[in-house]
């Protein structure tokens, strides 16, 4: 039997709960045998390739992720909005971390959990955390010598636990991505839609294959969107974040007497920098 929205939300809530009390075993057991964690998006993903019995072993890529980024820190989450559509759960959160060195940082993030059923139970198949790695690094470095020491310690920890490939995979989240260009594109998307400037809107998109999901799970071509759900729609965006080749935001959409508030994700073509897809999540 397919899990209900309440059951899926309860499943993903167990993730920050396990992190808060440093229950490694409980956290690892939330994920499927083939789960992937990309935290943040833009860094190299951590993919499981082991069977069920070995899922929580030291060879588990998710276990190495835990030991690198969770074990030495105290992490808490404040959720501002939870959205469930189909098998996906989206959360608008603030992540607070007290690092092992004593430095405290706050990172706004949008989380996408994709779930699946495994042996009759709901499991997390993918966790994609959209937050800005550059912003986090700036917070740490702003602490002066303590911050510099913290970054050096993190680098050595990654090298020890994940090897050179893991360190380089994490660093690519700082050097590769859409960054400010993505945030500008999202603002321009909303402005063009609100102005009914179809030419400007189409100019932001990566050709005819660009899909608009409004709501998420219902993919349409740009023209179908403009002629249907996007007609007479006004969208305001805030809280823009870029991670890798994607940008995300909180949105408020109005069409007549109907208002939706949720989280949107824009994916960009790395070659062109144009919008490849736009997905709008709200509780329908």
Regions found by a protein language model. Name each.
Residues 1-284:
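C-terminal and inter-domain tail/linker signature
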